[in-house]
C-alpha cells in the first residue's frame, strides 16, 4: 500500500497533461478515472476500455451514471492511498483488451491514475478530472511511466 505524502500531493495538483473543457477525438485504448469524466465520455458516445468510479464527486456529492457496464469489478481503496488490492486489479485489467469495464472503488479513486499509468501500455489515453478546470487527457509514454515511478518512490510504502 502506498500513502500520499505532502510532497506528492503538491505534485499531483499539477495536471499531467493538457486540460480540456471538451475533449478532442480519442483513438485506441481509453481509461477514464472519475465519475464526472466517465459520465461526460459516455454521454458523448465514447465507451472507455476501463472506467474507474466511486459514484461521488468532490469526495461526497453523489453521481448517477445511467450506464450498464459490460463487466464490473470492485476493490477497496481508502482515501489518500493506493491499496495493494487496487494495484493488483489494475495490473490485471491492463492485460484485457475489452471495452466497457468498470472498476468500482469503495473509498476513493483519485490516486488510481498512478497505477493506471504504471501498468497500462504506452499509447493508452488516460482521462481524469481536474477539479473546477476540466478534463486532463494524456497518452501514456515511457517518460510518463518514469515520472510515475518517481512519485511512487516519494510516497510512503506500507
Curated annotation (Swiss-Prot):
<feature type="binding site">
    <location>
        <position position="54"/>
    </location>
    <ligand>
        <name>GTP</name>
    </ligand>
</feature>
<protein>
    <recommendedName>
        <fullName>GTP-dependent dephospho-CoA kinase</fullName>
        <ecNumber>2.7.1.237</ecNumber>
    </recommendedName>
</protein>
<feature type="binding site">
    <location>
        <position position="36"/>
    </location>
    <ligand>
        <name>GTP</name>
    </ligand>
</feature>
<comment type="pathway">
    <text>Cofactor biosynthesis; coenzyme A biosynthesis.</text>
</comment>
<feature type="binding site">
    <location>
        <position position="56"/>
    </location>
    <ligand>
        <name>GTP</name>
    </ligand>
</feature>
<dbReference type="GO" id="GO:0015937">
    <property type="term" value="P:coenzyme A biosynthetic process"/>
</dbReference>
<feature type="binding site">
    <location>
        <position position="132"/>
    </location>
    <ligand>
        <name>GTP</name>
    </ligand>
</feature>
<comment type="function">
    <text>Catalyzes the GTP-dependent phosphorylation of the 3'-hydroxyl group of dephosphocoenzyme A to form coenzyme A (CoA).</text>
</comment>
<keyword id="KW-0418">Kinase</keyword>
<keyword id="KW-0342">GTP-binding</keyword>
<dbReference type="InterPro" id="IPR007164">
    <property type="entry name" value="GTP-dep_dephospho-CoA_kin"/>
</dbReference>
<keyword id="KW-0173">Coenzyme A biosynthesis</keyword>
<dbReference type="GO" id="GO:0016301">
    <property type="term" value="F:kinase activity"/>
</dbReference>
<keyword id="KW-0547">Nucleotide-binding</keyword>
<dbReference type="GO" id="GO:0005525">
    <property type="term" value="F:GTP binding"/>
</dbReference>
<dbReference type="Pfam" id="PF04019">
    <property type="entry name" value="DUF359"/>
</dbReference>
<feature type="binding site">
    <location>
        <position position="109"/>
    </location>
    <ligand>
        <name>GTP</name>
    </ligand>
</feature>
<feature type="binding site">
    <location>
        <position position="35"/>
    </location>
    <ligand>
        <name>GTP</name>
    </ligand>
</feature>
<keyword id="KW-0808">Transferase</keyword>
<comment type="similarity">
    <text>Belongs to the GTP-dependent DPCK family.</text>
</comment>
